C-alpha cells in the first residue's frame, strides 16, 4: 500500500504520522452523578510501533484516510482480581489491566516490534472476538483466524474457539476446536462456555450458525441462521436459561367463596395468612413482599425471599384479628 498512499501525496515512510489513527478509550461513569471517574486510553499504554501488517486494515485506511488502529471489541471486569481484560482485534492481542492503577499486567498474543507482548505468540490467534473468564482461571475467546495462514501455517483462514491457560508469565493452549474452512468468520462471532461444560461457538460463516461442542470435540447441537452478508451478519449468540427472567405467580392459600365473595376467613385473635409464590422462570428470582390491610390487622410487614428456578415457596404473615365479624381488604405487593 506504500505506492497507493504516496500517490495520494503522503510520505508513507513508516515514521511520519500523516492522518489520524483511531484508538480506544475505556470510560467509567458514576451511575448517579454521571461524572467520569476513571479512564484508560490505548494511546497511553500501547506503542504505535505495533500495528497490523497483514490483515487488510490499511485497505480501509486508504479509503477513509484514517487508520482503525486497535479496534477493542470485548471488555470484561473481574471483581475478584480487580482487573480488566480487553480484546484488541487489530493487534491480535488480549490484555489484562490492573484496576484502578491502569497498569498493564500482561499482553497476550502476536509478538510485535515494541516487545510489549510477553506471551502467547505460539498460540497464533488473530482478529479475535469475545472474552470469557472461566471458573478455572482460563480465558475463552473466539479466534477468527484471519491471519491463521501467516500465524499458524494453515492453507486458508480457519476460525476456532480456544481456551487459554495462563500461569504467571506463561500461556498455553488448553483446549481448542477448529471450524471447517467454509465456516470461517472474517468478523464477529463468539465462544461461550456453558454450564454443562460444552462450548457454544457462533460464526458468520456458512450463512451464520451456532454450534455446541462438547469437551471431546464432538458436535452435539447446531443452529443455522441462513443469513446473507453483510446485513445479515450475526454478531454474537448467548445461551440463556429462558426468555422470562421474572415470570411468577402468587396463590392465596385457603381462599374460599366465589366471585366478589372470595376471601380468607380468619379467626379472631392471633392468626396468619399465607401465600404460595411460584417461580415459573428459569432464573433465580429475588422478591420483596409487602403486606398491608385496611383494619391494620397485619400492620406493615415486609419479607424478602429468593426462589430457585421452577420452584414454589410458602410464605406466611402473622396478624391480630380484632373481630371475626369484620372484613378488611388485604393487599400484598410483590416486587
Predicted regions and their residues:
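Histidine-/acidic-rich catalytic cores in large beta-rich domains
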Residues: 1-293, 317-330
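Surface-exposed, proline-enriched loop/turn segments that connect beta strands in immunoglobulin-like
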Residues: 260-261, 300-303
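Short, solvent-exposed loop/linker segments at beta-strand-coil boundaries, enriched for Pro/Gly
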Residues: 293-299
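Short proline/glycine- and polar residue-rich coil/turn motifs
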Residues: 304-313
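Enriched for extracellular/lumenal, surface-exposed ectodomains of secreted and cell-surface proteins
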Residues: 332-335
Amino acid at each position: 500500500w506504500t505506492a497507493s498512499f504516496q500517490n495520494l501525496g503522503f510520505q508513507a515512510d513508516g515514521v511520519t504520522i500523516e492522518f489520524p489513527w483511531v484508538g480506544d478509550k475505556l470510560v467509567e461513569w458514576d451511575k448517579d452523578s454521571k461524572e467520569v471517574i476513571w479512564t484508560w486510553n490505548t494511546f497511553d499504554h500501547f506503542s504505535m510501533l505495533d500495528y497490523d501488517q497483514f490483515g487488510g486494515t490499511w485497505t480501509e485506511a486508504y479509503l477513509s484516510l484514517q487508520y482503525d488502529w486497535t479496534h477493542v471489541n470485548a471488555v470484561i471486569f473481574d471483581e475478584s482480581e480487580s482487573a480488566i481484560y480487553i480484546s484488541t482485534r487489530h493487534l491480535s492481542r488480549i490484555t489484562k489491566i490492573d484496576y484502578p492503577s491502569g497498569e498493564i499486567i500482561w499482553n497476550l498474543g502476536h509478538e510485535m516490534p515494541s516487545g510489549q507482548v510477553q506471551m502467547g505468540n505460539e498460540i497464533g490467534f488473530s482478529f479475535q472476538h469475545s472474552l470469557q473468564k472461566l471458573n478455572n482461571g482460563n480465558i475463552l475467546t473466539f479466534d477468527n483466524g484471519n491471519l491463521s495462514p501467516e500465524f499458524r501455517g494453515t492453507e486458508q483462514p480457519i476460525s476456532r474457539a480456544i481456551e487459554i491457560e495462563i500461569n504467571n508469565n506463561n500461556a498455553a493452549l488448553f483446549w481448542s476446536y477448529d471450524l471447517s474452512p467454509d465456516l470461517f468468520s472474517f468478523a464477529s462471532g463468539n465462544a461461550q462456555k456453558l454450564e454443562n461444560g460444552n462450548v457454544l461457538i457462533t460464526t458468520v460463516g456458512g450463512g451464520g450458525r451456532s454450534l455446541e461442542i462438547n469437551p471431546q470435540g464432538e458436535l452435539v447441537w447446531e443452529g443455522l441462521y441462513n443469513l446473507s452478508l453483510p446485513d445479515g451478519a450475526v454478531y454474537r449468540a448467548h445461551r440463556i436459561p429462558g426468555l422470562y427472567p421474572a415470570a411468577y405467580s402468587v396463590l392465596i392459600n385457603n381462599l374460599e367463596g366465589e366471585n366478589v365473595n372470595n376471601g380468607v376467613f380468619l379467626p379472631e385473635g392471633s392468626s396468619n395468612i399465607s401465600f404460595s409464590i411460584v417461580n415459573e422462570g428459569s432464573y433465580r428470582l429475588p422478591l420483596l413482599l409487602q403486606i398491608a390491610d385496611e383494619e391494620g390487622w397485619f400492620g406493615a410487614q415486609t419479607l424478602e425471599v429468593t426462589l430457585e428456578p421452577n420452584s414454589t415457596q410458602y410464605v406466611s404473615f402473622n396478624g391480630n384479628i380484632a373481630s371475626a365479624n369484620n372484613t378488611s381488604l388485604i393487599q400484598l405487593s410483590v416486587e
